[in-house]
Amino acid sequence: NEREKDSYVNQDIVPERTSLNVHFKVPSAGYQEMFSQMEADGVISTRGIKADAFRYGELVFDVNSAYFYNHGGYDFAKQFYTDAYKSAIKIVGGEQYILSAVMHADERNRAMSEALGEDVYHYHLHVVYIPVVEKEIRWTKRCKDKSLVGKVKETIMQVSMSKKWASKP
Protein backbone atom coordinates (compact mmCIF):
# COMPACT_ATOMS: atom_id res chain seq x y z
CA ASN A 1 0.00 0.00 0.00
CA GLU A 2 2.95 2.31 0.44
CA ARG A 3 3.79 2.35 -3.29
CA GLU A 4 7.48 1.56 -2.85
CA LYS A 5 7.84 -0.66 -5.93
CA ASP A 6 9.11 0.46 -9.32
CA SER A 7 6.31 -1.29 -11.21
CA TYR A 8 2.91 -2.80 -10.44
CA VAL A 9 0.64 -5.48 -11.87
CA ASN A 10 -2.22 -2.97 -11.69
CA GLN A 11 -1.85 -1.10 -14.97
CA ASP A 12 -4.13 1.71 -13.75
CA ILE A 13 -1.58 3.03 -11.24
CA VAL A 14 -0.15 6.31 -12.50
CA PRO A 15 3.32 6.66 -10.89
CA GLU A 16 3.40 10.42 -11.58
CA ARG A 17 0.43 10.83 -9.20
CA THR A 18 1.86 8.77 -6.32
CA SER A 19 2.94 11.99 -4.59
CA LEU A 20 -0.77 12.86 -4.31
CA ASN A 21 -1.42 9.82 -2.11
CA VAL A 22 -2.30 10.99 1.40
CA HIS A 23 -0.66 9.21 4.34
CA PHE A 24 -2.75 9.55 7.46
CA LYS A 25 -0.29 7.26 9.24
CA VAL A 26 3.10 6.37 7.79
CA PRO A 27 4.57 3.11 9.08
CA SER A 28 7.62 3.71 11.27
CA ALA A 29 9.16 0.40 10.09
CA GLY A 30 8.06 -2.88 8.50
CA TYR A 31 4.81 -4.28 9.86
CA GLN A 32 6.51 -7.27 11.49
CA GLU A 33 9.04 -5.01 13.22
CA MET A 34 6.30 -2.65 14.42
CA PHE A 35 4.28 -5.61 15.70
CA SER A 36 7.27 -6.97 17.64
CA GLN A 37 7.99 -3.54 19.15
CA MET A 38 4.37 -3.11 20.26
CA GLU A 39 4.49 -6.54 21.86
CA ALA A 40 7.79 -5.73 23.61
CA ASP A 41 6.34 -2.42 24.87
CA GLY A 42 3.26 -4.18 26.27
CA VAL A 43 0.84 -2.35 23.97
CA ILE A 44 -0.43 -5.70 22.65
CA SER A 45 -0.28 -9.28 23.87
CA THR A 46 -0.02 -12.48 21.85
CA ARG A 47 -0.76 -14.60 24.91
CA GLY A 48 -2.72 -17.66 23.77
CA ILE A 49 -2.51 -16.83 20.06
CA LYS A 50 -1.87 -19.73 17.69
CA ALA A 51 1.30 -19.69 15.60
CA ASP A 52 -0.66 -19.57 12.33
CA ALA A 53 -3.20 -16.96 13.46
CA PHE A 54 -3.69 -13.75 11.50
CA ARG A 55 -1.86 -10.85 13.11
CA TYR A 56 -2.97 -8.04 10.81
CA GLY A 57 -6.23 -6.76 9.45
CA GLU A 58 -7.06 -4.30 6.71
CA LEU A 59 -9.96 -1.94 6.31
CA VAL A 60 -10.56 -0.61 2.81
CA PHE A 61 -12.84 2.40 2.47
CA ASP A 62 -13.95 2.57 -1.14
CA VAL A 63 -16.57 4.75 -2.80
CA ASN A 64 -17.68 4.90 -6.41
CA SER A 65 -15.38 7.13 -8.48
CA ALA A 66 -18.35 9.09 -9.84
CA TYR A 67 -19.17 10.31 -6.33
CA PHE A 68 -15.84 12.09 -5.98
CA TYR A 69 -15.83 13.23 -9.60
CA ASN A 70 -19.24 14.89 -9.07
CA HIS A 71 -18.33 16.45 -5.70
CA GLY A 72 -14.96 18.12 -6.28
CA GLY A 73 -12.48 15.37 -7.03
CA TYR A 74 -9.21 15.16 -5.12
CA ASP A 75 -9.88 17.82 -2.46
CA PHE A 76 -13.29 16.38 -1.67
CA ALA A 77 -11.81 12.86 -1.47
CA LYS A 78 -9.09 14.07 0.94
CA GLN A 79 -11.69 15.49 3.31
CA PHE A 80 -13.95 12.46 2.96
CA TYR A 81 -11.12 10.04 3.78
CA THR A 82 -9.86 12.23 6.63
CA ASP A 83 -13.25 11.60 8.23
CA ALA A 84 -13.09 7.91 7.27
CA TYR A 85 -9.69 7.63 8.98
CA LYS A 86 -11.19 9.08 12.17
CA SER A 87 -13.85 6.36 11.95
CA ALA A 88 -11.15 3.71 11.43
CA ILE A 89 -9.45 4.82 14.65
CA LYS A 90 -12.71 4.21 16.53
CA ILE A 91 -13.34 0.88 14.78
CA VAL A 92 -9.94 -0.60 15.66
CA GLY A 93 -9.93 0.76 19.22
CA GLY A 94 -7.30 3.47 18.93
CA GLU A 95 -4.69 4.92 16.61
CA GLN A 96 -1.94 2.99 18.40
CA TYR A 97 -3.18 -0.21 16.71
CA ILE A 98 -3.00 1.27 13.21
CA LEU A 99 0.23 0.47 11.38
CA SER A 100 -0.47 2.30 8.14
CA ALA A 101 -3.21 4.39 6.57
CA VAL A 102 -2.99 5.77 3.04
CA MET A 103 -5.48 7.25 0.61
CA HIS A 104 -4.57 6.23 -2.92
CA ALA A 105 -5.02 9.02 -5.46
CA ASP A 106 -2.89 7.45 -8.17
CA GLU A 107 -5.24 4.85 -9.66
CA ARG A 108 -7.02 5.81 -12.85
CA ASN A 109 -10.58 4.59 -13.37
CA ARG A 110 -10.14 3.33 -16.92
CA ALA A 111 -13.82 2.79 -17.80
CA MET A 112 -14.97 6.16 -16.48
CA SER A 113 -11.99 7.96 -18.04
CA GLU A 114 -12.76 6.46 -21.45
CA ALA A 115 -16.48 7.24 -21.15
CA LEU A 116 -15.86 10.90 -20.21
CA GLY A 117 -12.82 11.47 -22.40
CA GLU A 118 -10.72 12.72 -19.47
CA ASP A 119 -8.73 11.17 -16.64
CA VAL A 120 -10.85 10.20 -13.66
CA TYR A 121 -9.15 8.76 -10.59
CA HIS A 122 -10.34 6.13 -8.14
CA TYR A 123 -9.78 7.37 -4.57
CA HIS A 124 -9.82 4.85 -1.72
CA LEU A 125 -8.30 4.40 1.74
CA HIS A 126 -6.29 1.41 3.02
CA VAL A 127 -5.91 1.03 6.79
CA VAL A 128 -3.64 -1.78 8.05
CA TYR A 129 -4.08 -2.52 11.75
CA ILE A 130 -3.51 -5.07 14.47
CA PRO A 131 -6.85 -6.59 15.52
CA VAL A 132 -7.16 -6.59 19.29
CA VAL A 133 -9.80 -7.36 21.88
CA GLU A 134 -9.76 -6.30 25.50
CA LYS A 135 -9.23 -9.33 27.71
CA GLU A 136 -9.42 -9.54 31.49
CA ILE A 137 -6.87 -11.79 33.16
CA ARG A 138 -8.24 -13.06 36.48
CA TRP A 139 -6.53 -14.45 39.56
CA THR A 140 -6.67 -18.26 39.63
CA LYS A 141 -7.08 -20.74 42.47
CA ARG A 142 -3.30 -21.05 42.61
CA CYS A 143 -3.11 -17.53 44.06
CA LYS A 144 -1.93 -17.44 47.69
CA ASP A 145 -4.48 -14.76 48.65
CA LYS A 146 -7.78 -16.64 48.18
CA SER A 147 -9.77 -13.38 48.40
CA LEU A 148 -8.34 -12.43 44.98
CA VAL A 149 -9.47 -15.60 43.16
CA GLY A 150 -11.73 -14.69 40.24
CA LYS A 151 -10.99 -10.97 40.47
CA VAL A 152 -9.38 -9.06 37.62
CA LYS A 153 -5.60 -9.22 37.86
CA GLU A 154 -4.93 -7.18 34.72
CA THR A 155 -6.54 -6.15 31.45
CA ILE A 156 -4.60 -6.73 28.25
CA MET A 157 -5.14 -5.93 24.60
CA GLN A 158 -4.91 -9.37 23.06
CA VAL A 159 -4.24 -9.84 19.36
CA SER A 160 -7.30 -11.71 18.11
CA MET A 161 -9.26 -12.30 14.93
CA SER A 162 -12.38 -12.98 16.99
CA LYS A 163 -15.97 -12.58 15.81
CA LYS A 164 -15.59 -8.87 16.56
CA TRP A 165 -13.66 -8.57 13.29
CA ALA A 166 -15.94 -10.71 11.10
CA SER A 167 -17.07 -8.96 7.92
CA LYS A 168 -20.71 -8.00 7.95
CA PRO A 169 -22.80 -7.34 4.83
Task: Give a label for each model feature.
Residues 1-169:
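N-terminal nicking endonuclease/strand-transfer module with a His-rich metal-binding environment
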